[in-house]
């Protein structure tokens, strides 16, 4: 089953629109979505802070900063969603 992870943090002005698009598309396609707040996790903050929001599809980085809905749908289709 295809899965999507969105890494985000409070105060990230780019994160909310990315999360909203990911939620809508994943709900429509029945794709598992995890929204991961990196706040307070030193390892995640070190790894992702400069790249927020970051979207992974099946554990692979797919989008950074912005989420193009059309390209997101195409990549999910290629992943089997």
Where do the protein language model's features map onto the residues?
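Structural micro-motif
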Residues: 49-55
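Non-catalytic, surface beta->alpha helical segment in thiol-disulfide oxidoreductase systems
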Residues: 59-81
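Thiol-based oxidoreductase modules, predominantly thioredoxin-like and allied folds used
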Residues: 31-42
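Short, flexible active-site loop motifs that bind/organize anionic cofactors or intermediates
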Residues: 5, 34, 62
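Short, low-complexity, intrinsically disordered N-terminal peptides in bacterial proteins
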Residues: 1-3, 24, 28, 73-81
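Chalcogenol-based redox active-site neighborhoods
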Residues: 45
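Local sequence-structure signature of Cys/Sec-based thiol-disulfide redox active-site neighborhoods
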Residues: 1-24
